[in-house]
Amino acid sequence: MRFLTGNVVVRARGADFFVAIDARSAGGADAWLALTNGAPLLRRFTLSPSAPTNLYDFTRAELRLWLSRRELNPVHAARIWSYLYLDLVEGFGAMTELPARVRARLEAEMCVGNLKIARETDSRDGFTRKYLLELADGAAIETVLMRFAGRATACVSSQVGCAMGCVFCATGQMGYTRHLTAGEIVAQAVHVARALRTAAFEKCHVMRDPSPGREAGEKSRDEADRHRAPPTPRLRNLVLMGMGEPLHNYEAVMRAVDILRDDGGLALGAERITLSTVGVVPGILRLAAEKRPVHLAVSLHAADQEERAALVPVAKKWPLDELMAACRTYSETTGRRVFYEWTLIEGRNDTAAHARAVGRLLRGLPAQVNLIPLNPTAGYDGTPGRTEAARRFQEILSREFALPSTVRQRRGIDIAAGCGQLAVAEQS
């Protein structure tokens, strides 16, 4: 079967369908790239007509409504919620206090998450664990867990791949497949919280909790702390800095944030969730207008439009002046500072002149700069900025511009869990 919708061709074969641009239509491949923010020309998807609904997609109010519409007492929503986010159950069999009728209906229509652990890898120093998670449709994502003294941070993905194409980012190099649902985002956080209740990390070293805006596998040099962890550390922080661009998947990401902040569940406070964007201006402005309770981190990497566009292609769509205007609006509207991320690449953006350019760009803004030495990826031939260059950069920001900054120590690099390293080799 084949049909057209605009310039897009959809071909179906059994449970599979393929989407591509009609080569005969105006624009051809260029039109496809414009429509999909650079996704490959042909994509294959598999339909799963009988797939159950992911219970993690529901807010508590929606769960009450779901019960009511099935003539079940909505009071059970509170117990279901506590099973999911306090007891961290993996299936309906553990929900023993629910009436049999309620549990049977849940089992018939729902699933408790839809992620499978395909692989888990620990860093040599014991600070970091990376999970390769398989989704219901066969796609895969990566999630990272970091341990600190008495608490932990989860770095979660928001998309399968990424359409933004940052040249030094492994996720950008793999291309974009699809958005994650809110439930798939929430399930990553629940998985990390559940893992923390096991004995798997008893011998791991831990770090002090980082300030907002730091990615998985990273911490500042002055925060190393090798005390042993308590037996049941709590998931305290969540960073949307894994695979994907969160503001490209705004609705699902914000729904996930609302679910994760619910006081009756994981209860992650506003000061404990950080969202990192490459600079999707409409999303930043929407965050500001809605005054969403999250920290905002912006991947800056260059203070010159031409230089930034070479590293971050989306800067061609949302130029630096538009991005900075949006960040100013965000801070003025919300009263929050913005964390500006700067990947230090030797000879590219790590000189004293670059530091002063950043200082001038951010002058007068409530800001903090997070300096991140480049992490290796297969698709980018660059060298991390040297320690002395990072210190000089930081000193200039502090001395000449009174601009706070951190220099991150690289963590989880041996398992490709650092900033910019998350990727899945093959996607169906």
UniProtKB/Swiss-Prot annotation:
GO biological process: rRNA base methylation; tRNA methylation
Subcellular location: Cytoplasm
Co-factor remark: Binds 1 [4Fe-4S] cluster. The cluster is coordinated with 3 cysteines and an exchangeable S-adenosyl-L-methionine.
Pfam families for this protein: Radical_SAM, RlmN_N
Transmembrane annotation, as ranges: none
Composition skew (Basic and acidic residues), residue ranges: 207-228
Primary role: Specifically methylates position 2 of adenine 2503 in 23S rRNA and position 2 of adenine 37 in tRNAs.
Family recorded in the similarity comment: Belongs to the radical SAM superfamily. RlmN family.
Note: Reaction proceeds by a ping-pong mechanism involving intermediate methylation of a conserved cysteine residue.
Name this protein carries in UniProt: Probable dual-specificity RNA methyltransferase RlmN 2
Organism: Opitutus terrae (strain DSM 11246 / JCM 15787 / PB90-1)
